[in-house]
Amino acid sequence: MITIDFSKGLVPTIILDDHNGEVLMLAYMSEESYQKTVETGYTWFFSRSRNELWNKGATSGHTQKVKQIWTDCDNDTLLIRVNQTGPACHTGKKSCFFHLIKEGD
């Protein structure tokens, strides 16, 4: 079993759409929210602004059913592939990444 490195408190977590690989959002997980995610099969995060756990979609219904959980080479960043119900972003957009800053040639 791989041990995730929570020594710095929170772990950046990238959420991908399992159907097409699109990046949906970036959030942070505490050890407790990670355990809840593993146990329930739905994403749980730690809100830095509210200083509390939150279950993605609990209020909006826009849930994220976990399909796969990956870790990076240092075990301090997570990538989770999900089946997304509704938009992932609180703005109503499918992805939180919709502001293009620069486009290459």
From Swiss-Prot:
User: Where Zn(2+) is bound, by residue?
Assistant: 73, 89, 96
Q: In which pathway does it act?
A: Amino-acid biosynthesis; L-histidine biosynthesis; L-histidine from 5-phospho-alpha-D-ribose 1-diphosphate: step 3/9
List the residue ranges forming a coiled coil, or say none. none
What GO terms fall under cellular component here?
cytoplasm
Pfam families documented for this protein? PRA-CH
Keywords for the protein's UniProt record, in alphabetical order: Amino-acid biosynthesis, Cytoplasm, Histidine biosynthesis, Hydrolase, Magnesium, Metal-binding, Zinc
What is its cofactor?
Mg(2+); Zn(2+)
Q: What is its EC number?
A: 3.5.4.19
Q: How is the cofactor bound?
A: Binds 1 Mg(2+) ion per subunit. Binds 1 zinc ion per subunit.
Where is this gene product found?
Cytoplasm
**Which reactions are catalysed by this chain?**
1-(5-phospho-beta-D-ribosyl)-5'-AMP + H2O = 1-(5-phospho-beta-D-ribosyl)-5-[(5-phospho-beta-D-ribosylamino)methylideneamino]imidazole-4-carboxamide
Q: Which top EC class applies here?
A: hydrolase
Alphabetical list of InterPro entries matching this protein: PRA-CH (IPR026660), PRib_AMP_CycHydrolase_dom (IPR002496), PRib_AMP_CycHydrolase_sf (IPR038019)
Write out the similarity annotation.
Belongs to the PRA-CH family.
Functional description taken from the UniProt entry = Catalyzes the hydrolysis of the adenine ring of phosphoribosyl-AMP.
Protein name as catalogued: Phosphoribosyl-AMP cyclohydrolase
Identify the species of origin.
Listeria welshimeri serovar 6b (strain ATCC 35897 / DSM 20650 / CCUG 15529 / CIP 8149 / NCTC 11857 / SLCC 5334 / V8)
| Lineage of the species this protein comes from | Bacteria, Bacillati, Bacillota, Bacilli, Bacillales
The UniProt gene name for this protein comes to hisI
